[in-house]
UniProtKB/Swiss-Prot annotation:
<protein>
    <recommendedName>
        <fullName>Acyl-[acyl-carrier-protein]--UDP-N-acetylglucosamine O-acyltransferase</fullName>
        <ecNumber>2.3.1.129</ecNumber>
    </recommendedName>
</protein>
<keyword id="KW-0012">Acyltransferase</keyword>
<dbReference type="InterPro" id="IPR011004">
    <property type="entry name" value="Trimer_LpxA-like_sf"/>
</dbReference>
<dbReference type="InterPro" id="IPR037157">
    <property type="entry name" value="Acetyltransf_C_sf"/>
</dbReference>
<keyword id="KW-0677">Repeat</keyword>
<keyword id="KW-0441">Lipid A biosynthesis</keyword>
<comment type="function">
    <text>Involved in the biosynthesis of lipid A, a phosphorylated glycolipid that anchors the lipopolysaccharide to the outer membrane of the cell.</text>
</comment>
<dbReference type="GO" id="GO:0016020">
    <property type="term" value="C:membrane"/>
</dbReference>
<dbReference type="Pfam" id="PF13720">
    <property type="entry name" value="Acetyltransf_11"/>
</dbReference>
<dbReference type="Pfam" id="PF00132">
    <property type="entry name" value="Hexapep"/>
</dbReference>
<dbReference type="GO" id="GO:0009245">
    <property type="term" value="P:lipid A biosynthetic process"/>
</dbReference>
<keyword id="KW-0963">Cytoplasm</keyword>
<dbReference type="InterPro" id="IPR018357">
    <property type="entry name" value="Hexapep_transf_CS"/>
</dbReference>
<dbReference type="InterPro" id="IPR001451">
    <property type="entry name" value="Hexapep"/>
</dbReference>
<keyword id="KW-0444">Lipid biosynthesis</keyword>
<dbReference type="InterPro" id="IPR029098">
    <property type="entry name" value="Acetyltransf_C"/>
</dbReference>
<keyword id="KW-0443">Lipid metabolism</keyword>
Length: 262
């Protein structure tokens, strides 16, 4: 059974799933689609062609699906936001719709935890089980892999890719790509180590040891990172190690390393 407060505004055409809870003064636009058991809390706004998956919550005064903060945006149609199931979008977050410079959609996977005042710009692609701490700021076209964590007060430059199970520490500033399973920190942030806390939560001891060996081979040799990745990908059978190597070989923004490395 839907529970919609009498002061909430639901435009004609909006699709609201079963057991939705829409609180006072919330707004849901005509093109929005809310899954089952979705909660839109007091004063939150769901705009444009936004789709929110089952069992998700949008907290007070968050704004999901408004137009992008992009000076080249021209009132494009068929753009929007897609959010997976079990997402938590906390107070005052802003998530902008996509543009035709991407595929038109800003995407967020399942089990996202987006803390208060965070910003996700147009055309970002966010994996599943991602955490953004308070005031994390993603510029346009940023990509975060599954299980990535971005600390509070950290901005990420447009088009940057952060790999699977990465950690970007709080109060950092990131302008280059972070290899899967690694931890980056600083202003400007560079890769400091493996994200051991994160990978130990996901993988068994043998898998962690494979990643430790790969990290030492790639980053502690004082040799070209891409040369090391080419050599390692040719001889490893470990899928996680292959992900690291492939990411390095595909980067367009470069990998942030300590000074003196290339």
């Amino acid at each position: 059974m839907k529970n919609i407060h009498q002061t909430a505004v639901i435009e004609d055409g909006a699709i609201i799933g079963d057991d939705a809870n829409i609180e006072a003064y919330a707004f849901v636009s005509k093109d929005a689609v809310l899954g089952n058991n979705v909660t839109i809390k007091q004063g939150a706004r769901v705009l444009g062609k936004t789709r929110i998956g089952d069992n998700s919550r949008v907290f007070s005064y968050a704004i999901v699906g408004d137009i992008p903060q992009d000076i080249s945006y021209k009132d494009e149609v068929d753009t929007g936001v897609i959010i997976g199931e079990h997402a938590t979008i906390r107070e005052f977050c802003t998530i902008n719709s996509g543009t035709h410079k991407g595929d038109g959609i800003t995407r967020i996977g399942d089990n996202a935890f987006i803390m208060a005042y965070s910003h996700i710009a147009h055309d970002c692609i966010i994996g599943s089980n991602v955490i953004l701490a308070n005031n994390a700021t993603l510029a346009g076209h940023v990509e975060l892999g599954d299980y990535a964590v971005v600390g509070g007060l950290t901005p990420i430059h447009q088009f940057v890719r952060v790999g699977e199970s990465c950690m970007v520490a709080g109060a950092s500033a990131l302008s280059q790509d972070v290899v899967p399973f690694c931890l980056a920190e600083g202003n400007r942030a560079y890769i400091r180590s493996l994200n051991l806390v994160g990978i130990r939560r996901r993988f068994d001891k043998e898998q962690v040891e494979e990643l430790v060996r790969a990290y030492k081979f790639l980053f502690n040799q004082g040799i070209s990172l891409k040369d090391q990745a080419n050599e390692l990908i040719a001889k490893t059978s470990d899928e996680n190690v292959k992900k690291m190597c492939k990411f390095i070989l595909e980067t367009t923004r470069g990998i942030p390393l300590a000074k003196g490395r290339d």
